[in-house]
């Protein structure tokens, strides 16, 4: 735990006791502050009370006593409309912050020079965060991993000079962290997302920009217009900007050419790494993630040799292009995290042909219409869930398909068909382009079911990572 000593002897209001809220409350109290916490969910309030946290309805509180108001990132700050607790805080003139801001203030208070790498972007955040953490940890350095990746940031060990922090930040967390000042900040990409919470793409981009604007080194992917504009603006303001690209050959910066990762400066181009044979980092999207990780680790003082070793041993993340098994020449890949067509596109682009594609669930707007360019790579599709009839119409005569209905049936049929393919490496790919809620509690449960079905097939050799 990171006790928030920067708030010692102050009184703090907190709203939001699900997720990271209870951990945040405990860290505030451990630092010597008083707290009054609340939530709209009575069960969450009861859990907090059982954990020894002082609770009270903030609608009845005297807001003049509060030094700050700590808001859970899951609670609306601005859109579609501010939560009632936000209105009360603003009316009382009380500053509104989140758990990442508390970490930043504590770091500034006790160990301002400890390495702090923060990562954001619409897609690829978690993989990049996990990759950086893996590379650093593999060297034997003291590394703490947290934030939006799933570990509440204030449950980590307290800052000290030689302790590295690798923190994934959502737009919600950045919006509540006005002092965010990482030694290296990464902005991977920007596409429309969470606009119901931010009101417009411009607001969403402006929030993401804050993370890199106050960074010692701003590492920015420039393959979309929003990030390109941010990189240009920050460079013009005198901030150290390092550009990365998975699509463009840069005159100055880091870019990918297939599996080769290159650095260009002053008319010279050097190869700094290769992803050839690293299955956990397959595809152009992972080339961008790897470029960001390399630059961040170099800026933190790691050597290229250390970085290369970490890249090669990276196991990947579950449900994100996760290689779960192989039977003969057939590879089985779990990409259950792909809950829309935009997320499925990188998976389909990662394999040139002979894809046995398991797709379906609860369809999103547009279905798989945007994926038609990848249809020639698909040997056959196996349609599951509510989307089956809709996707069958989209595939039409372009791709052979069957309506499998269930994931278990799809795995069995796809494995048999792929095993009869004469290609050197047919791929059975679960990349559903859909939500999971028609048949599974969440994408993790869907991915687990796929993995279990694959590993239950006779003759399958389990895999994990880059082999």
Swiss-Prot record:
Which positions in this protein are listed as binding ATP?
121-127
Q: EC number(s) per UniProt?
A: 6.3.2.9
* Protein's pathway: Cell wall biogenesis; peptidoglycan biosynthesis
Question: Where does the UniProt entry say this protein principally localizes?
Answer: cytoplasm
Alphabetized, the UniProt keywords read: ATP-binding, Cell cycle, Cell division, Cell shape, Cell wall biogenesis/degradation, Cytoplasm, Ligase, Nucleotide-binding, Peptidoglycan synthesis
One MF term in the entry's GO annotations: UDP-N-acetylmuramoylalanine-D-glutamate ligase activity
Location comes to: Cytoplasm
Reaction catalyzed = UDP-N-acetyl-alpha-D-muramoyl-L-alanine + D-glutamate + ATP = UDP-N-acetyl-alpha-D-muramoyl-L-alanyl-D-glutamate + ADP + phosphate + H(+)
Matching entries from InterPro entries are given as: Folylpolyglutamate_synth_CS, Mur-like_cat_sf, Mur_ligase_C, Mur_ligase_C_dom_sf, Mur_ligase_cen, MurD, NAD(P)-bd_dom_sf
Q: Name one GO biological process term.
A: peptidoglycan biosynthetic process
Cross-referenced Pfam families, in alphabetical order?
Answer: Mur_ligase_C (PF02875), Mur_ligase_M (PF08245)
Q: Which GO terms describe its cellular component?
A: cytoplasm
Q: Which NCBIfam families match?
A: murD
Family of the protein in this entry? Belongs to the MurCDEF family.
Q: What does this protein do?
A: Cell wall formation. Catalyzes the addition of glutamate to the nucleotide precursor UDP-N-acetylmuramoyl-L-alanine (UMA).
Which protein, by its recorded name, is this?
A: UDP-N-acetylmuramoylalanine--D-glutamate ligase
Tell me the organism: Brucella abortus (strain 2308)
């Amino acid at each position: 735990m990171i006790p928030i000593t920067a708030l010692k002897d102050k009184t703090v209001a907190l709203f939001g006791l699900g997720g990271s809220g209870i951990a945040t409350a405990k860290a505030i109290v451990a630092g010597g502050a008083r707290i009054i916490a609340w939530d709209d969910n009575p069960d969450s309030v009861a859990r907090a009370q059982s954990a020894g946290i002082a609770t009270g309805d903030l609608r009845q509180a005297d807001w003049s006593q509060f030094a700050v108001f700590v808001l859970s990132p899951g609670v609306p700050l601005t859109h579609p409309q501010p939560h009632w607790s936000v209105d009360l805080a603003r009316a009382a003139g009380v500053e509104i912050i989140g758990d990442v801001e508390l970490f930043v203030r504590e770091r500034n208070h006790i160990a301002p020079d400890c390495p702090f790498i923060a990562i954001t972007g619409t897609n690829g955040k978690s993989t990049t965060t996990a990759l950086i953490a893996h590379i650093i940890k593999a060297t034997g350095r003291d590394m703490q991993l947290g934030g939006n990746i799933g570990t509440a940031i204030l449950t980590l060990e307290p800052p000290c000079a030689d302790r590295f922090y690798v923190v994934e930040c959502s737009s919600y967390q950045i919006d509540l962290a006005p002092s965010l000042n990482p030694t290296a900040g990464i902005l991977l990409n920007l596409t429309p997302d969470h606009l119901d919470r931010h009101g417009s793409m411009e607001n969403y981009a402006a929030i993401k920009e804050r993370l890199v604007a106050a960074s010692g080194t701003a590492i920015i992917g420039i393959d979309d217009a929003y990030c390109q504009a941010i990189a240009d603006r920050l460079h013009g303001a005198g901030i150290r900007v390092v550009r990365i690209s998975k699509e463009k050959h840069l005159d100055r910066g880091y870019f990918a050419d297939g599996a080769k990762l290159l650095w260009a400066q002053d008319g010279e181009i050097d190869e700094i790494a290769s992803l050839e044979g690293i299955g956990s980092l397959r595809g152009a999207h992972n080339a961008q993630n790897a470029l960001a990780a390399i630059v961040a680790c170099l800026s933190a003082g790691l050597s290229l040799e250390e970085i290369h070793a970490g890249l090669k041993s990276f196991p990947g993340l579950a449900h994100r292009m996760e290689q779960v098994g192989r039977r003969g020449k057939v590879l089985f890949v779990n990409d259950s995290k792909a809950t829309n067509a935009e997320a499925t596109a990188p998976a389909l682009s990662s394999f040139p042909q002979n894809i046995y594609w398991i797709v379906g669930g609860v369809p999103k707007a547009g279905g798989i219409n945007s994926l038609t360019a990848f249809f020639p790579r698909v040997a056959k599709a196996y349609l599951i869930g509510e989307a089956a009839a809709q996707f069958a119409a989209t595939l039409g005569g372009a791709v052979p398909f069957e309506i499998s209905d269930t994931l278990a049936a799809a795995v069995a049929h796809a494995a048999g068909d792929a095993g009869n393919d004469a290609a050197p490496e047919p791929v059975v790919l679960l990349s559903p382009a859909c939500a999971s809620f028609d048949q599974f509690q969440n994408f993790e449960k869907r991915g687990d079911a796929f993995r279990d079905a694959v590993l239950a097939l006779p003759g399958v050799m389990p895999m994990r990572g880059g082999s």
